[in-house]
């Protein structure tokens, strides 16, 4: 079953994105490059606890 996760910018700490993931299939923490509106550039966003 998919659970909701929050993606946080690693540079400024802004939490701009919500996503879903299946934690049984992918137990590791997700990290994606996304656009950060605060920094106004593409930065690495990681899954929060």
Swiss-Prot record:
Endpoints of the signal sequence: none
Gene3D superfamilies linked: Ribosomal protein L33 (2.20.28.120)
Stored InterPro entries: Ribosomal_bL33 (IPR001705), Ribosomal_bL33_CS (IPR018264), Ribosomal_bL33_sf (IPR038584), Ribosomal_zn-bd (IPR011332)
Any one Gene Ontology molecular-function term assigned to this protein's record: structural constituent of ribosome
A Pfam family matched in the record: Ribosomal_L33
GO biological process: translation
GO cellular component, one term: cytoplasm
Keywords for this protein: Ribonucleoprotein, Ribosomal protein
PANTHER family assigned: 50S RIBOSOMAL PROTEIN L33, CHLOROPLASTIC, LARGE RIBOSOMAL SUBUNIT PROTEIN BL33C
Family: Belongs to the bacterial ribosomal protein bL33 family.
HAMAP family: Ribosomal_bL33
UniProt name for this protein: Large ribosomal subunit protein bL33B
The organism's taxonomic lineage, starting at the top: Bacteria, Bacillati, Bacillota, Bacilli, Lactobacillales
């Amino acid at each position: 079953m998919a659970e909701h996760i929050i993606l946080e910018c690693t540079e400024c700490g802004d939490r701009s994105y919500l996503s879903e993931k299946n934690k049984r299939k992918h137990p590791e923490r997700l990290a994606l490059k996304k656009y950060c509106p605060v920094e106004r550039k593409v930065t690495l966003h990681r899954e929060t606890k």
